[in-house]
From Swiss-Prot:
Annotated domain remarks: The structure of the N-terminal domain remains unchanged upon phosphorylation.
Source organism of this protein record: Mycobacterium tuberculosis (strain ATCC 25618 / H37Rv)
The keyword Transport is assigned to this record: no
Name of the gene encoding the protein in the UniProt record: fhaA
Classification via PROSITE patterns: FHA_DOMAIN
Entry keywords, A to Z: Cytoplasm, Phosphoprotein
Biased composition (Pro residues): 271-283
Entry's Gene Ontology molecular function annotations: mRNA binding
Protein name (record): FHA domain-containing protein FhaA
Principal place of residence: cytoplasm
Gly residues: compositionally biased ranges: 300-322
InterPro entries documented for this protein: Cell_Proc_Reg/RNA_Proc, FHA_dom, FhaA_N, FhaA_N_sf, SMAD_FHA_dom_sf
Function, as annotated: Regulates cell growth and peptidoglycan synthesis by binding to MviN. May inhibit the late stages of peptidoglycan synthesis.
Amino acid sequence: MGSQKRLVQRVERKLEQTVGDAFARIFGGSIVPQEVEALLRREAADGIQSLQGNRLLAPNEYIITLGVHDFEKLGADPELKSTGFARDLADYIQEQGWQTYGDVVVRFEQSSNLHTGQFRARGTVNPDVETHPPVIDCARPQSNHAFGAEPGVAPMSDNSSYRGGQGQGRPDEYYDDRYARPQEDPRGGPDPQGGSDPRGGYPPETGGYPPQPGYPRPRHPDQGDYPEQIGYPDQGGYPEQRGYPEQRGYPDQRGYQDQGRGYPDQGQGGYPPPYEQRPPVSPGPAAGYGAPGYDQGYRQSGGYGPSPGGGQPGYGGYGEYGRGPARHEEGSYVPSGPPGPPEQRPAYPDQGGYDQGYQQGATTYGRQDYGGGADYTRYTESPRVPGYAPQGGGYAEPAGRDYDYGQSGAPDYGQPAPGGYSGYGQGGYGSAGTSVTLQLDDGSGRTYQLREGSNIIGRGQDAQFRLPDTGVSRRHLEIRWDGQVALLADLNSTNGTTVNNAPVQEWQLADGDVIRLGHSEIIVRMH
């Protein structure tokens, strides 16, 4: 009988809609508020769902679809207010003894398929609905995934008139399959700024900020998309700042050893030519960051001090992989003396960089008496000519050093690395953190990924993972996650919490644990 009754109601409603559309097409006319109220009440009655305990659940979100002309007149008609319709419909639902999960919300949207005087209404059960007070900010068409299962579900609104529990009803019964409606976005259309660039790239122009080296030229709001900038090279960007490469500041000071020249011998001053420009390298002191450009500046014996002939530059371990520290007995070790020509070496492996001044023995900081008088080599295992460290030390010395933290070979923090910084954060301490996902085992597919700190699970508005289950307290349990350990704690809930069918107050979660609260089950997944 119930199915026959619904069929008859459906046929009657279809006939009413057909007749009403025909009159609207022929005679036109405006929308009458009483007709809208009647349609909303009929939609609420048609959307009733039966729950356990002889309770009836009505939709709480209603979308009224109007033609374009009627939609534009909404702001001028004070009787066509979504808040007024929602208030009247909520009173009607309460009078009928029905329940809703969430506040009753009425929204308007437009459709180009409807003529003047035609309108449609549809109702859905949406626990995540939020009230939008402005009428003109009408609801945009619902997307197919608006209420789908997403990690970190936003707080749901709560209906204060909802009394009593829903029993064993599955939470996914609240989700209506009518969310997937045709999308008719009133704000759709081409991008108003999608036109061509009126400037046509970057012709010379006056006014505004002048084209500054190092910063993009000023753009008009209607200029168009970013690709028209033609990238940084054509802007003159950082390269034309005459940036860091040929600063010749620290290198041409000859570290701190040639302090007689000091800063006045910084060469061109300011920010020298770009990395791409490679001015000739003087055969004198090493250019460090400068003369040969970006790559050679790091692979020549630059840095804070010049590399004596044959000396090992930069992070010594990078330069000659596997070679032990140079000793002053060796012929290639020159403790002091005039700097030789820059030594051309391949890119990064022999980078001179910052370490040069700390590895050249007496050649660095020497003439300023920073290292000439004191024996800083006592921090390594071999006495050397005074200086900060024996040549070839540095971070990347791969074998047998007393500062490689007990490893006999190249540093290995999870994968082979040529030394020093390149192995950091890979393996060892774990390059990727563990994540914990809670999966609601009710067929809805809802999941929630734990955030670091407190994660509240319950039925209330302040819960990060809300469950539409009246057997669940508003603040039922808390899971604290610190990136390594997930600790569950029951928050004095009414019906309690079980993990793997065992009642718990506190519990350290593991992969595969099954949390039961109210009539809901949550499976813990650790990745």
